């Protein structure tokens, strides 16, 4: 969904405190290639709307200086690795934290293969060669390692779910629009919460169901993926999974 000015104001008024927008390139061809659009013109149109959305979010009160507005980019080796520096430059100009995401095998339809993963360390090295960086670290239960530009140009973050899994302290639980709870982004199935929501809400039962789900979770998909080919880097996907469009990021 592209963010318009009115929607941004409505979300802010409703109590939303932060927004992350996604952009995988800074030219029409790159955007089209990564989004599966018809051509450079279609990609350029989407790029224009994303740049406008950044302005709408800022005007609505989502302040990037307070971490309320960030920019995500998924990077693949042959798809948009050439966009690393342009994306970093755009984020620096806009005062946004750029969050680079390793290409992940979420779902079953994105054509994921290990060879297309551009490791976080390589992404950081490429950007750091242009604008020197110093590490900030990864917050407890956080998904991204963070770096600070030494020239004061803001921060860079990288989600290294493939090459540096963080399953051990992950505390993410996702609930889909149709009421199913997933305790891992890479899960194949979840727990249906609707029995505690319909025909009337059972708050105590819902709380107990969520507590039981969390205490019983054994999710460590990213760690298990690496164990398939120990010492050889990224392993192959393990099993079918729910699609990202269904789960959310």
Over which residues does each language-model region extend?
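Canonical radical SAM enzyme core domain
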Residues: 1-18, 23-30, 40-49, 73-86, ...
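Auxiliary Fe-S-binding modules of radical SAM enzymes
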Residues: 86-93, 103-249
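A short acidic, helix-capping loop that chelates divalent metal ions and anchors anionic groups
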Residues: 5, 27-35, 107-111, 192-194
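Structural preference for beta-strand elements that scaffold enzyme active sites
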Residues: 18-20, 68-70, 97
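Short glycine-enriched, charge-decorated loop/helix-capping segments at active-site entrances
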Residues: 32-44, 112-115
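Conserved strand-turn element in the central/C-terminal portion of the radical SAM core barrel
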Residues: 28, 38, 53-87, 100-111
């Amino acid at each position: 969904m592209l963010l318009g000015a009115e929607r941004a104001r409505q979300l802010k008024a409703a109590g939303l405190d932060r927004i992350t927008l996604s952009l995988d390139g800074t030219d029409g061809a790159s955007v089209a290639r990564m989004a599966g659009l018809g051509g450079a013109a279609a990609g350029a149109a989407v790029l224009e709307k994303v740049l406008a959305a950044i302005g709408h979010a800022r005007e609505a009160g989502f302040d990037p200086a307070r971490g309320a507005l960030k920019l995500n980019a998924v990077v693949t080796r042959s798809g948009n690795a050439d966009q690393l520096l342009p994306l970093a430059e755009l984020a620096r100009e806009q005062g946004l934290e750029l969050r680079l995401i390793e290409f992940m095998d979420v779902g079953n339809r994105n054509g994921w293969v290990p060879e297309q993963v551009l490791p976080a360390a390589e992404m950081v090295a490429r950007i750091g060669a242009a604008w020197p960086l110093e590490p900030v670290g990864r917050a407890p239960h956080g998904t991204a390692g963070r770096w600070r530009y030494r020239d004061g140009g803001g921060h860079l973050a990288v989600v290294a779910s493939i090459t540096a899994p963080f399953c051990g302290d992950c505390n993410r639980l996702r609930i889909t629009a149709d009421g199913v709870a997933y305790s891992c982004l890479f899960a194949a199935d979840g727990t249906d919460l609707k029995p505690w929501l319909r025909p009337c809400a059972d708050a105590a039962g819902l709380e107990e169901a969520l507590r039981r789900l969390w205490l019983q979770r054994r999710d460590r998909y990213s760690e298990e993926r690496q164990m398939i080919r120990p010492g050889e880097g990224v392993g192959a996907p393990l099993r079918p999974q729910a699609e990202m469009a269904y789960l959310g990021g």
